[in-house]
Amino acid sequence: AYLIAVTDRITHLSKGDLGHSAISGTPVLDELVQHMPPTLTLLACGAGLALAVGLPLGLLFAFGAIRRIAAPFMQIATATPLFCAGLAFAYGAVQLLHWPVSVNMRVGLAVPPDQALRLAALPIATVGLAGAAAVQLALRRAAARSSGEAFRTGLKRLGLSGMEIEFLYVMPQIIAGLLASAGEIALALVSAAVVAEWVFNRQGAADLFVQSVALADWNMTAVILFAFACLTIVTGFFGRIAGYLLAREEMA
């Protein structure tokens, strides 16, 4: 009976039948296509905020004594549970700004532009700040690796100042290290999106993933997990290629 069930399942998979969602009863691929655009939009906006915040912080804390002073504080900040940060954002928005953060944003629901902006601001901030922590960590890690490079001594003997060495030779290596960490940053953004969509009741693919796990809907869970894994792997792959090409061009 087990072999028959496995054979039957493989036959359905070969035909593109991945099962049906336990939540809506629709095919899992249709459910994924319906819920993925809001999550991709959240990830894109969060990535933009992560770069806008993480790049200046990472570069500020990447050089000299500032890196050593800021290291323990940044470790504490990055270790803060994202769930707690999301709840803090929600509490501040309700108590201080009087924003409606608990409205259930259903797919296809039309809302006024100002309300849509308020509903989107907190999830984007949650995802963006989580991504910013990953960005600045990648920059500081790349700066720490480049701080012991042997070419610094040779360049100083050629008459270059420390500032020229940092910006002309070290900075490209740091940016290359950031690009090489694109997969880790994407993983941080996806993880933050799961928390943000669940805390702020946004019905995207990340929230659907949480619901599917709770209902033991493993067909839906596997498809969403595969989509997120592909997104992270592809981002990391192209990021590593870009980082390698940038570092190679600089060394040439």
Say what each PLM segment does.
Residues 74-130:
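Generic hydrophobic transmembrane alpha-helix motif, especially the helices
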Residues 32-68, 82, 111-252:
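Alpha-helical transmembrane segments of integral membrane proteins
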Residues 22-28, 105-108, 226:
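Short linear capping/connector segments at secondary-structure termini
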Residues 20, 97, 197-198:
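Flexible, active-site-adjacent loop/turn segments at secondary-structure boundaries
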Residues 13-17, 96-100, 146, 189:
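A short secondary-structure junction motif
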Residues 1-51:
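An internal, D/E-rich "acidic patch" concept
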